[in-house]
Amino acid sequence: MIVVRNVFRLKFGKSKEAVALFKEGIAIQKRAGVEMNQRILTDIVGTFYTLVLELTVPNMGALEANMPKVMGDKDWQANYQKFSALVESGYREIFMIVE
């Protein structure tokens, strides 16, 4: 199993708006037929205005197979364009689950 964490540093005060857009994005993914185990995480302590989309997938192939389906969806693209306007920076972490 693989855990993918997409970590976004948001613009000041934009967490609630970003979470709402991410929830909408996940709904769009499901309508497109892409079901992934996902969680939305927000900061409690540490760097302010951090949002994480965490995915758990069986392997990298499963992630690679689903990404074109999601990113090719016009509704998802429109949603992500709104979301990206709220982001200062971001990065991705990919981990193998050992236990």
What does each model-identified segment do?
Residues 5, 50-52:
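Structural preference for beta-strand elements that scaffold enzyme active sites
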Residues 39-44:
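Short, solvent-exposed loop/turn elements at beta->coil junctions and helix N-caps
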